[in-house]
Amino acid sequence: MAGWSRIVLVGGLVALAAAEWHVGAAAQRSEVAPADQYVDPSAGPQFTEGREIYQQNCAGCHESGAGRAPLRFVLLQLAPRAIREALTNGAMRLQGSGLSPAQKTAVAEYLTATKSSAEPPAPPPYRRCTGAAARFDFAQPPAYDGIGLNPSGDHAMPDRVAGLSPDQVGKLRLKWAFAVPDATRLRSQPALAGGALTFGGSTGEVFSLDRETGCLRWMFKASAEVRTAVLVEHWRAGDAKAHPLAWFGDITGNMFALDAVSGRLRWKRRVTDHPAAGISATPALYKGVLYVPTSSLEEASAADPHYPCCTFRGAVIALDGKTGRTLWKRWTVGEPKPLGASANDTTKFGPSGVAVWNTPSVDVKRGQLIFATGNTYSAPADAMPPWSNAVVALDLKTGRERWHNQLTQGDLWNYGCIVKVAKVNCPGEGGPDFDFGAHTVVAHTARGDVVLAGQKSGVAYGLDPANGKVLWQTRLGRGGATGGIHFGLAARDGTAFVPVNDIPDPNVNGFPISPGLYALDAATGARRWAAPASETTCAGRPRPECMPGLGAGVSTTSRLVLTGAADGHLRIYDAANGKVLWDMDTWRGFDGLGGIDGRGGSIAGAPAPVLWQGELFVASGYGFANRQPGNVMLAFTAR
């Protein structure tokens, strides 16, 4: 490929690095690179300062594989400017707060084995739209409502909108690829409105592309990585005087409202004051109100034995979409208070945590907002309200609790539990880290509505929407800190579709590791079919970044189920029996538009594939939790 691409600049070093960069890597060595052939590309004296900073501040997590911290081979694939951005405004901003700009540059150069003076030039400008492609189409209001595609969050696409039948699946072909330079992941499900495809990226930009050609209509620079989908306000089809807004959040806790036509900023609001707080999950949008869930990176800060752990607490905030004004705010746990000193004479705080990693679903019939929560970061385990690892329902208008059901008790966990030098920050023995990462779904069945929830423990639940009582629970996988039911759920015509991301986890035993896609009776939890993950697609590819598990969002029509996997494969299944009808390997290079080439990688995170009139859109690349990086938005067509 002749175009610009930093993600593959180091070429074969990527596969080699996977063999040796972390503690215990012998068990994970790539079959393509014998260890005795590996030479550390950043071992030279020109990287001494950065190496020392890294060893003192970063190695504890990045060389032990602690939690979701990316291993060295992932960091090696980045450009220095991407590391600097992460330390300044991104996921590592707290860890980077004590470093000077020169120190950030030094560690960025060491981690990427690239001196800034030798850094590749900025990419060529994106191909801008002209003529008809640049015009906003007021005849096309949003095709779907948010990341869940409708208020209930069931990821069901109407057949008339999707426009793809089983007999057309085999006709799908790549139409265009849009690459985002320096990005390592795309975790933003694209919005379809006004003839545009709009999404965010890990480098902090939001892009609005012409859906037909992939050219750039506008681009907006946010404060940090955008992991949420972009929500576009509805308007009456054909109303050329409409001024729809486009909303999204970034991982530093800012909500933005843009003019959906031009990309100009209308308002910006930081929804929480905690320095580690962010917005990872897409807000729910209903009748002009944004319901914003907050999560946090603070559990990673606990890997520092001198960090005063922990003070973040999750929340859901209701905002007026037009103005950003707060309508109500509901904390998920009580206010943290000092709890004495640790063995390092550092003040401890608690309770804390209970982040909301998933998009709430709207139970329109009962006027309630339903979401699931994460674990507690610090004691006490019985903090009030007992909402950790729970499914919670709030009144849509007031935020008052309707009901809650805590499905795993006593799950206190932070990175101090897996970094030896930081054990002083681990609460007790440390819990299993069984968050609810997947969004809830209000599923409609012949027996009535059921709230679906999926946990990292590998268990799927059906709850009564009236009171939260468990109607059924079905174990599908072994589960683990990065396994089990990780992000996506879908439901259609009384069937729940559940992806399982099981990977080997030394802390979890018992049930067999069972990655794959499962169909359950949404009313009873009975298994209808199972489609185990492929055991062959990772052959010849380095571990651990290639795993066959399914940890991405799922979408469905009446006859099709679509989802991606950590092995980079995008698959379409027969909804009736789980048979794979179409399989596209995206773990490869792509000729990007405008000479900006890119690569696909793992498909993971909350975004799901989206269909519109026989065209399929999906992001590939998930440089997180040691999955394969990538930087492309792909468009396929069966027309």
Where do the model's predicted regions map?
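Extracytoplasmic electron-transfer domains, predominantly the class I c-type cytochrome c fold
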Residues: Q28, D40, A69-S117, Q368
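Electrostatic cytochrome c docking/interface patches
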Residues: Q28-I53, P124-P125, T130-A133
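Beta-propeller blade signature
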Residues: L258, F312-R325, P386-R400, I513-G525, ...
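Surface-exposed loop and turn segments in beta-propeller and other repeat-based domains
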Residues: A179-V180, R270-D273, K329-G350, R402-G431, ...
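A structural motif specific to WD40 beta-propellers
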Residues: R173-K175, C215-W218, R264-K268, L327-W328, ...
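The canonical Cys-X-X-Cys-His
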Residues: G50-G65, I83, V107
